[in-house]
Structures are given as C-alpha cells and as structure tokens.
C-alpha cells in the first residue's frame, strides 16, 4: 500500500514519536508499505511520521548511491526504535531534500559519522557505525522521529526566505507525483 506523504505544517511532524514493541500489529506489512511508499515517491529514506504514524521507525534504501560509495551496495534497512549513541567526526555540508518539504532543497551541516543502536524488522538489536551518505540519511530520518525537520537546522535568515514556499506546501500548492496529506485534512 502506498501511503500519502504528510507534509510540512502537520503537527504530527513536530511530535516525538513513540517506541513500538515486537507485537506491533502487522509490522512486516508496515515495513513493506513504507519501502513501497518511499520508492513510489522517489525517496531514499522515509520515517513513520511522514506517513502519519507517530512511531519510532524509519526505512532507508541507499543502494542507488553505491557507485559513489561502494559500501552502500546492500544498504537497505528498517530501523526500529533507533537511538543515535554518538555523532562523531568533522561536520560536512550536503544538499538535502525531504518528501515532507517538496521542492525545497538546502545545504545542511551534519557530523560525518554516527553510531546507532536499533532493532531490525525481526526485532534483533544492532549497534553499528555509519559514515558518509548513510550517516547523513540516518540522521535526517532519525530527526523526523524527534519532530525535527532539516529546515530547523538552517540559519534563521535562510528559514525566513523559505516562508513563501512553506506556506505553499501547507496549502497543497506544490505539486508532487505522490499524494500529500495536508495539515488539518484526514
């Protein structure tokens, strides 16, 4: 099932998501649906709040970037109840976008490496360290679980310059190939 993408302005995107347990109803289907929604929307990652669920899970498939970073060749994962243990290394800037902020791309500064603890879709715990593009996408999706969007990491002047675009998003005036769930709409 392809979910509509919850876009900027919906209060759910600003909530801290709740952990889930291994008995979460139809977890395998949810993970599959999240990947399907992400692929349909041309995303690299997708967090549950972006499909209207305030739970601590995100999915990433960075395999299409394996030409630039060979270690991404098999990087397709679900992260359940993740916890970033450590952010390390030099900060670096990269242009980011977000399905919940269509047509907005901005340079965002993030640490180059993260150490993360999470459960996979079988509720097996992992503690792993990622760098480069994988670390960036993990941090971006993880932020969604804490109600943070990449525009929050921009300087105040840059954010002010985006006000018109953000207003257009909340009103559904930014066309996308995917269905959008607008603020205040069911």
What positions do the PLM features span?
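Active-site rim/adjacent substrate-binding subdomains
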Residues: 1-139, 144-186
């Amino acid at each position: 099932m392809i979910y509509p993408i919850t876009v900027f302005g919906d209060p759910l995107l600003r909530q801290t998501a709740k952990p889930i347990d291994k008995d979460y109803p139809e977890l395998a289907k949810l993970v599959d649906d999240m990947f399907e929604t992400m692929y349909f929307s041309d995303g690299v990652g997708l967090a549950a709040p972006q499909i209207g669920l305030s739970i601590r899970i995100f999915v990433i498939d960075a395999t299409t970037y394996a030409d630039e970073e060979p270690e991404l060749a098999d990087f397709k994962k679900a992260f359940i109840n993740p916890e970033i243990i450590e952010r390390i290394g030099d900060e670096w800037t990269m242009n980011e976008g977000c399905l919940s902020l269509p047509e907005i791309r901005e340079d965002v500064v993030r640490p180059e490496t993260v150490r993360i603890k999470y459960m996979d879709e079988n509720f097996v715990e992992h503690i792993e360290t990622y760098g480069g593009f994988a670390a960036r996408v993990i941090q971006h999706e993880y932020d969604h679980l804490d109600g943070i969007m990449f525009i929050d990491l921009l300087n105040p002047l840059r954010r002010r310059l985006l006000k018109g675009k953000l207003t257009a998003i909340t009103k559904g005036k930014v066309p996308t190939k995917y269905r959008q769930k607008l603020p205040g709409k069911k």
